[in-house]
UniProtKB/Swiss-Prot annotation:
The gene is rhaD. Binds 1 zinc ion per subunit. One of its GO terms (biological process) is rhamnose catabolic process. This is Rhamnulose-1-phosphate aldolase. One of its GO terms (cellular component) is cytosol.
């Protein structure tokens, strides 16, 4: 019998959650992570599955995700503990045939359940599947320190925030030319914040929750982690720059245009226009 904890997807989740905790982005039970899988990924590990998988209904049906398996972090679970006990802190779930709920196939032992932000994740997965023709498979939410800090001092506007991050580090425009979506402050763990996040995910691979954290989407765990890491690095630079009295010089609009042309990306027009 193959051990599912040695699979690429469990090992990938262990690395991503451990790295995020070491970055300081996921204190206590902060943050959540979901990865969309294929049946072929989990097929070799059926012998590891629960004999009687628990079924949990979704608060709203998501037919686009019907019959789709995911690996997810658990509600109330600490990222720092995933590496110590993957089966207690992670779970593999599979949405049922009509998208009305899901079965917990593996993990989430001792009656644990998936992250409370699962509605936001699933709704965002739906939008990123449509926006990227199925390419994006990961949704990651974390409490990236400097990005959160900037939501207290910058205007919480997509164009303004995006332009500042682009100017904070040259690679940012290349990594997220589609900019950063921003929500108003909302109560977490609700369908409402999930729907608002998904709406922004139609246009942006990064979405900020002011005074709370960030959502990122990408095709792989590495790409999604790297996306957030890049934005957070720029935010860290900006925090230092602002604390030293602000910018004396920066990357100009013409230089940002040249950067986009060199790397074949189309920058968010509203941010470029500022």
């Amino acid at each position: 019998m193959q051990n599912i904890t040695q699979s690429w997807f469990v090992q990938g989740m262990i690395k991503a959650t451990t790295d995020a905790w070491l970055k300081g982005w996921d204190e206590r039970n902060g943050g959540n992570l979901t990865l969309r899988l294929d049946d072929a990924d989990i097929a070799p590990y059926h012998d590891n599955f629960h004999q009687q998988p628990r079924y949990i209904p979704l608060s709203q049906p998501m037919p686009l995700l019907a019959n789709t398996p995911f690996i997810v972090t658990g509600s109330g679970k600490f990222f720092r503990n995933v590496q110590l006990d993957p089966a207690a802190n992670l779970g593999i779930v599979k949405v049922d045939s009509d998208g009305a709920g899901y079965h917990i196939l593996w993990g989430l032992t001792n009656e644990a359940v998936p992250t409370s932000e699962l509605p936001a994740h699933f709704l965002s997965h739906c939008e990123r599947i449509k926006a990227t023709n199925g390419k994006d498979r990961v949704i990651m939410h974390c409490h990236a320190t400097n990005l959160i800090a900037l939501t207290y001092v910058l205007e919480n506007d997509t164009a303004v925030f995006t332009r500042q991050l682009w100017e904070g580090s040259t690679e940012c425009l290349v990594v997220f030319p589609d900019g950063v979506g921003i929500l108003p402050w909302m109560v977490p763990g609700t369908d409402e914040i999930g729907q608002a996040t998904a709406q922004e995910m139609q246009k942006h691979s990064l979405v900020l929750w002011p005074f709370h954290g960030v959502f990122g989407s990408g095709p792989t765990l590495d790409e999604t982690f790297g996306l957030i890491d890049t934005a957070e690095k720029s935010a860290q630079i900006l925090v230092k720059v602002y604390s030293m009295g602000g910018m004396k010089q920066t990357i100009s609009r013409e230089e940002l245009i040249a950067l986009g042309q060199r790397f074949g990306v189309t920058p968010l027009a509203s941010a470029l226009a500022l």
